[in-house]
Amino acid sequence: MGVAFDKCDTRPAHIDAILNGLDRYNPETTTVFQDYVAQQCEDRTFDCYANLALLKLYQFNPHLLQAETATNILAKALTVFPSPAFSLCLALLPAHTQPFPTADADASQTSDFVESVQKLARLSTLLESAQYAQFWSTLNSDDLYADLVADVAGFEELVRIRIAVEVGKAFREINAEVLEQWFDLRSREALEKFVTEVCGWEVDKAGPNGTVVKVPSNKENEVRSEVKSEHVGVEMFGRVIRRGFEQAA
């Protein structure tokens, strides 16, 4: 059974009290939530429900918006893909931060924040569409990307682990060269250490097609034959035929 969306095992008691009370909509709690986002970045935790509450406060009180905190929330959401977290957070950003602002949008608002949101949205699209090599290529293509994820401790490692989880669902065996690109681990030694120590997979160097990585079977990647059959009794045909005669009469 999945964990409820509004639950987080690592959530502090004072944050839980705010989320379950009227103070959730109190602008004075904005700083408390912002400090909690910073804590999540340091502790490698993610509390989507609390982060959405902060973004909702920003939506109600645009003047309180902290661009760095908002982008940190989006960057943290990337580390829990595939999930709706990033899309939900993106949808709650104030109108002037959207890539396509309305005609009456405040022109004084900095465009740097909009650019940052667009870049993070691009990374999210690449991850959600399983374009892992392109994700790393894009991440490494611009120093701004590095700045956007700099506050998130272990960002690259967290993303690699999520990629590994998705790979483990789809493959039983995969070429090491492909994984080097998907994990952005250009050293074979680094790749072998990651897949064996972190993922618990096996490296086979004696394969006919070069080094391959073998993934243990699980309920997602195991091939199963499934036979479906339905029993249709004679009495069912009898009812259909009888109904046809009744309508004709």
UniProtKB/Swiss-Prot annotation:
A GO CC term assigned to this protein in UniProt: eukaryotic translation initiation factor 3 complex
Keyword Heme included in the entry's annotation: no
Cell location: Cytoplasm
Domain PCI: 46-222
SUPFAM superfamilies: ARM repeat, Winged helix' DNA-binding domain
Pfam families (alphabetical): CSN8_PSD8_EIF3K
A GO term, aspect molecular function: ribosome binding
GO BP, sorted A to Z: formation of cytoplasmic translation initiation complex; regulation of translational initiation
Alphabetical keyword list: Cytoplasm, Initiation factor, Protein biosynthesis
Superkingdom to which the source organism belongs: Eukaryota
Family, as annotated: Belongs to the eIF-3 subunit K family.
Oligomeric and partner information: Component of the eukaryotic translation initiation factor 3 (eIF-3) complex.
The protein's role, per its UniProt record: Component of the eukaryotic translation initiation factor 3 (eIF-3) complex, which is involved in protein synthesis of a specialized repertoire of mRNAs and, together with other initiation factors, stimulates binding of mRNA and methionyl-tRNAi to the 40S ribosome. The eIF-3 complex specifically targets and initiates translation of a subset of mRNAs involved in cell proliferation.
Stated name of the protein: Eukaryotic translation initiation factor 3 subunit K
